[in-house]
Amino acid sequence: MFFFRFLTTVLLLFNAKLLVAQSSNTSSPVHWDKYSLSINGERLFVFAGEFHYIRLPVPELWLDVFQKLKANGFNAISVYFYWNHHSASEGVYDFETGGHNVQRLFDYAKQAGVYIIARPGPYANGELSAGGYALWAANGRLGGERTRDSQYYDLWSPWMTKIGKIIAANQITEGGPVILVQHENELQETTHRANNTLVLYMEQITQILDAAGIVVPSTHNEKGMRSMSWSMDYEDVGGAVNIYGLDSYPGGLSCTNPNAGFNLIRTYYQWFQNYSYTQPEYLAEFQGGYFTPWGGVFYDDCASMLQPEYADVFYKNNIGNRVTLQSLYMAYGGTNWGHIAAPVVYTSYDYSAPLRETREIRDKLKQTKLLGLFTRVSPDLLQTEMEGNGTSYTTGANIFTWALRNPETNAGFYVVAQDDSSSTTDVVFDLEVETSAGSVNITNIGLDGRQSKIITTDYKVGDTTLLYCSADILTYATLDVDVLALYLNKGQTGTFVLANAASHLKYTVYGNSTVTSSNSSQGTIYTYTQGQGISAIKFSNRFLVYLLDKYTAWDFFAPPLQLSDPNVKPNEHIFVIGPYLVREATIKGRTLELTGDNQNTTSIEIYHGNPFITSITWNGKHLSTKRTAYGSLTATIPGAEAITITLPKLTSWKSHDMIPEIDPEYDDSNWVVCNKTTSFNAIAPLSLPVLYSGDYGYHAGPKIYRGRFGSTNATGVTVTAQNGNAAGWSAWLNGIYIGGVTGDPSIEATSAVLKFNSSTTLKQEGSENVLTVLVDYTGHDEDNVKPARAQNPRGLLGVIFEGSTSTNFTSWKLQGNAGGEKNIDALRGPMNEGGFYGERLGWHLPGFEPSTKSGWDTRAPSDGVDGGSHRFYITEFTLDLGPNSHALDVPIGIHLNASSTSGPAVAYVWLNGYKFAHYLPHIGPQTVFPFQPGVLNIQGSEGHKRKNTLAVSLWALTDQPAALDVVELVAYGKYTSSFDFARDWSYLQPRWVDRSKYA
């Protein structure tokens, strides 16, 4: 807690040079000082959100996400560029195919009107396999990763050069959206010496990016308040970036205990003043949610992470700390499709983010929008000094106040929250503020539990100035008149005074709020009690004030008329209240064209202030409007509530054995021979030959091994596998299941002693025994996992005979994903497939035709599999949403459930070739898996059938049978939409070709 009241007290903590604002000296239009970023000479509050295009493999949907974030107050997107997504093998890069086409990312950002903060690594983290390192390099070849090691440099520098040039071509200097470029990621500068290996490594990154043509400011993100790294203002010995950033995940929230956490950090300001005092305060990653692990609580069931109150209190606290650059991690999480995840996460990467994995808008995003729209129109907020903070501003000591003051305009911003930020008690208090008319005691300010407010003084609204206002400002517009929007919780009291206005202006109130006026020495005080819905005050000087309750404010949009400009001015947007989403607002001739999405039939209100507009359309259809007494227009737009969605039943299954490799006579002549006695990896194997899959070019996905040995008196084998948390494995001797491990969410390396039964499993003398081991895979480790970090090996660490020292394997062979590093399915990329038999043959791909002549039958997943067995199932379906399918957004997923008698199992689901579900029913937590349009085909109006190929594999990990008694399509919400999701997506769905050589 900080109980000092005045800036002079604060200054005792810091060096006098804190007062000196340092400007940037880059050659780009992006500049900075100690207050904020400036672009083209205008200060900007950077309200960014993290988005990972790798987790949404349909490029067209990137625009959908960007439009939703822009409409909800964001003006920038922070993006990791993952090396492993673009490079399947050394020297090979793909920046053009499908979801690898990063130019489309930049183009969509420009179209939506959002800036890009580029984060190219080379190490990224982000709960992605190997933290984003190319998997072909993460097999031990990286050497001294994240150091100046020349072996490491030789591998990462080509990547950074190539992606650096692409980013450079899309900088704001070139007409693109990129305004900042981050060097590395959360790299802690533990030693401040010029010859330190980390310093030299950061210098190498700077040199590579400079040579690639990067001229916008560089940034870095400190890994919490643990070290002081790469700031020009603190022990700069090299490697420092232009703008220091801090990552913070302060919530301390619990999915199982709703009363836990919710504790604010109130020391950001002090931290930045100590370590980056000439730079704007930048929270490069601020908690927008959090990931949950295998065996944890699923995101939809974690109410504490989804609460909109978190966005209200924590993001306003950042404002109080004088932060002017903020990026929420994540804004949209997406899906860990294929095998892109690190072992700490499962298929969903929803992250409890403001925008759901299904691309649906959560209440948390609606609440976030209220602050985003406020910062967009508040330039005085971008040049403030800390006037003071503490509990002495209010009556009673239970309210904490941040007091910020713009020294040039005298505008003040008082951020108030309960001192105990986790309190759920409602409180009422008075607040003393300073205004241009002197000190004022604002009375009767209410805070509900877990609520925060920004009280403003001397705040300009066009030609009008608020001397003070105790309600939250949502936004304002300067149109034909000045229009202000305020919001409060229903029943709360707000007061405001108009500076330099005539006393007792006449006014008319519309709606359910009650308004009174009274005299004061500073002017007329207007006091109101917030009613439900929309209220408005029309003053005789034409000033218009909207009074909105919080839930109505959630449905408030201020779409800009200049779509591609992220820096929206008050005279460049209009107001639309009521829809689920407003994507765009454009004026063509005398028509205002609105596009967007809507859930239920809704009354909307529009204030555009343009006398030349004579008609309004919504998604191309003319609206019948009525004019209100205060100049807005009202209309009704349709929703999707009356549309019946009938999902097809998944029937007509075809099934085939998925583990023919356990047959001792199986032909593995085309498999890779494991014959290495040394490894790229520094971790010594437990036995020879080396069985690390990465040494043989197989990286992502399950792998299968076959080891041969002669007659033996051994009593068994000890198998040790390492394939990520929760990854299980099974073993068969001469076609007979002999055991395995079911996987543990807290352990990534597992070992088991498998006993031989000589009477049933071992071959007689002179014959050959075959041990087959099938291993699951949950990803490569990130940098924080010892001993070898992202280079921890995958596959089998060793297989050792028990009871015999003379028995040895005569050979080992291995199969992984078809083609290994050749990346034979370039569009879906190098991390989509694994080494299951049916995958290698392409059974999961559209166009594959199962034939009863080749061992296929009509069993369904509900029929199940015997213990220690593995089957593949395939069916087709058509999704017809009706004649208006092009104007609907109906997120679809698949629900899986193991039967009550099912043993531990692994189930995978592929849709049109994309692996979109990794289901471990004995571990959890996920049971419903969303499918994205583009991966999913939706029947259009063109007439031809757009089929979907759905494939399921079911693997019983023990000798217990396993079955899926539920495999069904489910719908999430349904919305009318201007975004066409029922397109021809065939370019994203390459069809089956013969792959028999990979058997």
Curated annotation (Swiss-Prot):
GO process annotations (BP): polysaccharide catabolic process
Residues annotated for substrate binding in this entry: 80, 125, 127, 185, 249, 351
Broad class of where this protein is predominantly found: secreted
Cystine crosslinks: 255-302
Catalytic residues (UniProt): 186 (proton donor), 285 (nucleophile)
GO molecular function, one term: beta-galactosidase activity
Catalysed reactions listed for this entry: Hydrolysis of terminal non-reducing beta-D-galactose residues in beta-D-galactosides
EC number, as in UniProt: 3.2.1.23
Keywords: Carbohydrate metabolism, Disulfide bond, Glycoprotein, Glycosidase, Hydrolase, Polysaccharide degradation, Secreted, Signal
Residue positions with a glycan: 25, 195, 274, 389, 441, 512, 519, 600, 675, 713, 757, 808, 897
Localization per record: Secreted
Signal peptide stretch: 1-21
Keyword Transcription regulation: no
UniProt-listed PANTHER family: BETA-GALACTOSIDASE RELATED
Membership in a protein family: Belongs to the glycosyl hydrolase 35 family.
Task performed by this protein: Cleaves beta-linked terminal galactosyl residues from gangliosides, glycoproteins, and glycosaminoglycans.
Entry protein name: Probable beta-galactosidase C
The organism of origin for this protein: Talaromyces marneffei (strain ATCC 18224 / CBS 334.59 / QM 7333)
Chain's gene name: lacC
